[in-house]
């Protein structure tokens, strides 16, 4: 069984657990997905627990920068953006840009030659 989680300041209303569980179970994978709200004071303990005990986890505000020193390395867009929203095997990734690009493509929007402002990623 995959052990997954999301960590953020207050993730009590997050849909991440339902979304990831639905998708993974649809693919025939058994998983659990924990919502881990963390204060700044508890972040060190929680980050270490996630890295030691979970297969992968998501990171949301305000910890997308704070998680980086705990990681072995960052790859891809996480290097470019300097922020991490997904961790697997001690490696940090950022899927925000790819997700945004996919949304544009799926809605027939071509940003080529246009100015784009992204807020809240």
Sequence positions of predicted segments:
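Phosphate/diphosphate ligand-binding glycine-rich loop within oxidoreductases
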Residues: 2-109
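Conserved beta-strand elements of the Class I
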Residues: 5, 117-119
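Glycine-rich Rossmann-fold phosphate-binding loop(s) that bind the pyrophosphate
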Residues: 9, 120-121
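Short helix-loop-beta connector
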Residues: 109-115
């Amino acid at each position: 069984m995959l052990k997954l989680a999301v960590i953020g300041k207050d993730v009590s209303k997050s849909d991440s657990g339902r979304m990831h569980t639905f998708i993974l179970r649809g693919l025939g994978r058994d998983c659990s997905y924990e919502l881990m709200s963390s204060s700044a004071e508890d972040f060190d303990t929680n980050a270490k627990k996630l890295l030691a005990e979970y297969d992968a986890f998501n990171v949301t505000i305000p910890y997308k920068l704070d998680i980086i020193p705990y990681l072995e390395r960052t790859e891809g867009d996480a290097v470019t953006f300097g922020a991490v929203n997904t961790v697997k095997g001690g490696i940090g990734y950022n899927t925000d840009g790819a997700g945004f690009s996919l949304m544009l493509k799926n809605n027939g929007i071509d940003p080529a030659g246009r100015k784009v402002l992204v807020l809240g990623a």
